[in-house]
C-alpha cells in the first residue's frame, strides 16, 4: 500500500495573514520547487495539458475513458537538471474524464496549467488524520492533496457515477470538484495526489475554519491543533463557541437544497465520513490587516529584492484571475470563489462564508462496520459517533448543518 509521501513536508507552513508574498518569476518554465516531487508534478501537469490540447474533444466520453491513463518515464533528464530530478515517472489517471470535469466546472485548461506550473505550490499546514499532506497552488485557486492507493481505487469506483452526477447538476454542487489525479515517482518514492478547487477564496482571507461532521464524540480540536495560526476546529468547538452561520432565507434555502441532493448521492454510493468545511472571512478584520500591511510595505519601500508580488507573473498576461477590476472589501467573484456566501444584513459581524463538502472517498465497508460496533460498545448505542451507516450519517449530517444556519 502506498501511503502519503512527504510532499514538501520539510517546508515551513505558509502564514495565513493577509501579507504580500513574493515569488521569483519563471520566464521559462523551470518547475523550480523545494521538493523534487513538486517539480515533477509541475512538469507533469504542464506536459499533460500540452498533450491534451492536441487531442480533439470527443462528443461524449466512452467507458474506456474511465479506465484510461497516460504515463511517462524520464531517464537521464539533463535539461534544467538543477531543478528537476534526472529520473522520474509521472502518471495521469483518466485524463479525458478530468478534462471534461474541468470544463463542466468552468475551468479553462490554460488557466489550470498556469495555476499549477507558473510558480511552485505553497505548503499548507493542514494535515488529515490519515497523514495526507496539502499544498495550495501559488494563486490559491487549487488544493493538491496526497492520497493513498485505496483512495485511487475508490475514485475509480465512483468516477463514472460522479461524472454523471456533475453532468446532471450542471456542475452546481457542494461536492469536491475533482480536477486531476496523478501518481509521481522520484528516487523510489511513490505518491498519489488529487487536485481539487479550493473551497476558500483566492483573495479573501479566512480567519476561522471548521470541519463539521454532525458528530459530537471525539469531535474537538486537539491542543496541538489549536496552537496553529489557523487551526481546523470541529463540531464541539463550533457548539461551545456558540458559532452560527448568518445567511438570509434565500441563500439558506438554495444551500440546503444543494447539500441535501449532494448528500443523498453520497449515501447512494455508500460513502460516509465526509465533512462540511467552513471558512469564515471577517470583512472588518481583513480591512484592518490590509491597512497594517500597507503601512509595513511603506516602511520596506526601497528594499527591492528583484522579486514580484503574487498574482499574475510578468509573462502570463492571459491569466484571467487578475484581469478583472479590483473588488471592494468583502466582495468576491462568484465564478472563481464558487462556494462564497455573504452574511445577511442583521449579522452581528460583516462576514463571508465559504462552505463545501470534503473528504468523500470513505466507503462503508467491513472495516467501518467493525469500527462502528467497537465505538458503540465504548460510547453506548445512543452516542453520536461518526462511524454510523451512510443513511444514518447523511441524515444526522443534514440535521446538524440545518441547525447551524440562522
UniProtKB/Swiss-Prot annotation:
Its EC number is 2.7.1.149. Catalyzes the phosphorylation of phosphatidylinositol 5-phosphate (PtdIns5P) on the fourth hydroxyl of the myo-inositol ring, to form phosphatidylinositol 4,5-bisphosphate (PtdIns(4,5)P2). Has both ATP- and GTP-dependent kinase activities. May exert its function by regulating the levels of PtdIns5P, which functions in the cytosol by increasing AKT activity and in the nucleus signals through ING2. May regulate the pool of cytosolic PtdIns5P in response to the activation of tyrosine phosphorylation. Keywords: Acetylation, ATP-binding, Cell membrane, Cell projection, Cytoplasm, Kinase, Lipid metabolism, Lysosome, Membrane, Nucleotide-binding, Nucleus, Phosphoprotein, Transferase. Residues 59-65 are annotated as: Required for interaction with PIP5K1A. Phosphorylated in tyrosines. Phosphorylation is induced by light and increases kinase activity. The keyword Membrane applies. Homodimer. Interacts with PIP4K2B; the interaction may regulate localization to the nucleus. Probably interacts with PIP5K1A; the interaction inhibits PIP5K1A kinase activity. One of its GO terms (molecular function) is 1-phosphatidylinositol-4-phosphate 5-kinase activity. Residues 289-304 have a biased composition (Acidic residues). The modification Phosphothreonine is found at residue 3. This is Phosphatidylinositol 5-phosphate 4-kinase type-2 alpha. The modification N-acetylalanine is found at residue 2. It catalyses: a 1,2-diacyl-sn-glycero-3-phospho-(1D-myo-inositol-5-phosphate) + ATP = a 1,2-diacyl-sn-glycero-3-phospho-(1D-myo-inositol-4,5-bisphosphate) + ADP + H(+); 1,2-dihexadecanoyl-sn-glycero-3-phospho-(1D-myo-inositol-5-phosphate) + ATP = 1,2-dihexadecanoyl-sn-glycero-3-phospho-(1D-myo-inositol-4,5-bisphosphate) + ADP + H(+); 1,2-dihexadecanoyl-sn-glycero-3-phospho-(1D-myo-inositol-5-phosphate) + GTP = 1,2-dihexadecanoyl-sn-glycero-3-phospho-(1D-myo-inositol-4,5-bisphosphate) + GDP + H(+). Residues 33-405 form the PIPK domain. It holds the Pfam family PIP5K.
Amino acid at each position: 500500500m502506498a501511503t502519503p509521501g512527504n510532499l514538501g513536508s520539510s517546508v515551513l507552513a505558509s502564514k495565513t495573514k493577509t501579507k504580500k508574498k513574493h515569488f521569483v518569476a519563471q520566464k521559462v518554465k523551470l518547475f523550480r520547487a523545494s521538493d523534487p516531487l513538486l517539480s515533477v508534478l509541475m512538469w507533469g501537469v504542464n506536459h499533460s495539458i500540452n498533450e491534451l490540447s492536441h487531442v480533439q474533444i470527443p462528443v461524449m466520453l466512452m467507458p474506456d475513458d474511465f479506465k484510461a491513463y497516460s504515463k511517462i518515464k524520464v531517464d537521464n533528464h539533463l535539461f534544467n537538471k538543477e531543478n528537476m530530478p534526472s529520473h522520474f515517472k509521472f502518471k495521469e489517471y483518466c485524463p479525458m474524464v478530468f478534462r471534461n470535469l474541468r470544463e463542466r466546472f468552468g475551468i479553462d485548461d490554460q488557466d489550470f496549467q498556469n495555476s499549477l506550473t507558473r510558480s511552485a505550490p505553497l505548503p499548507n499546514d493542514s494535515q488529515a488524520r490519515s497523514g495526507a499532506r496539502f499544498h495550495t497552488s501559488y494563486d490559491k485557486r487549487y488544493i493538491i492533496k496526497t492520497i493513498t492507493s485505496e483512495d485511487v481505487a475508490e475514485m475509480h469506483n465512483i468516477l463514472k457515477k460522479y461524472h454523471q452526477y456533475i453532468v446532471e447538476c450542471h456542475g452546481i454542487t457542494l461536492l469536491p470538484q475533482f480536477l486531476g489525479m496523478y501518481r509521481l515517482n522520484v528516487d523510489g518514492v511513490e505518491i498519489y495526489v488529487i487536485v481539487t478547487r479550493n473551497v476558500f477564496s483566492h483573495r479573501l482571507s479566512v480567519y476561522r475554519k471548521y470541519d463539521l461532521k454532525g458528530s459530537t464524540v471525539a469531535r474537538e480540536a486537539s491542543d496541538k491543533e489549536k496552537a496553529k495560526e489557523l487551526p481546523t476546529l470541529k463540531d464541539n468547538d463550533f457548539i461551545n463557541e456558540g458559532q452560527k452561520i448568518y445567511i438570509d432565507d434565500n441563500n439558506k434555502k438554495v444551500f440546503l437544497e444543494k447539500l441535501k441532493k449532494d448528500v443523498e448521492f453520497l449515501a447512494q454510493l455508500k460513502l460516509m465520513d465526509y465533512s462540511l468545511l467552513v471558512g469564515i472571512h471577517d470583512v472588518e478584520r481583513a480591512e484592518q490587516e490590509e491597512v497594517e500591511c500597507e503601512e509595513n510595505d511603506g516602511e520596506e519601500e526601497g528594499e527591492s529584492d528583484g522579486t514580484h508580488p503574487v498574482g499574475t507573473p510578468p509573462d502570463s498576461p492571459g491569466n484571467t484571475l487578475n484581469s478583472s477590476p479590483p473588488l471592494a472589501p468583502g466582495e468576491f467573484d462568484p465564478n472563481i470563489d464558487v462556494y462564497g456566501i455573504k452574511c445577511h444584513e442583521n449579522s452581528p459581524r460583516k462576514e463571508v462564508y465559504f462552505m463545501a463538502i470534503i473528504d468523500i472517498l470513505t466507503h462503508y465497508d467491513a472495516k467501518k462496520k467493525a469500527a462502528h460496533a467497537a465505538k458503540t460498545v465504548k460510547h453506548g448505542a445512543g452516542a453520536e459517533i461518526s462511524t454510523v451507516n451512510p443513511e444514518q450519517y447523511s441524515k444526522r449530517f443534514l440535521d446538524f448543518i440545518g441547525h447551524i444556519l440562522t
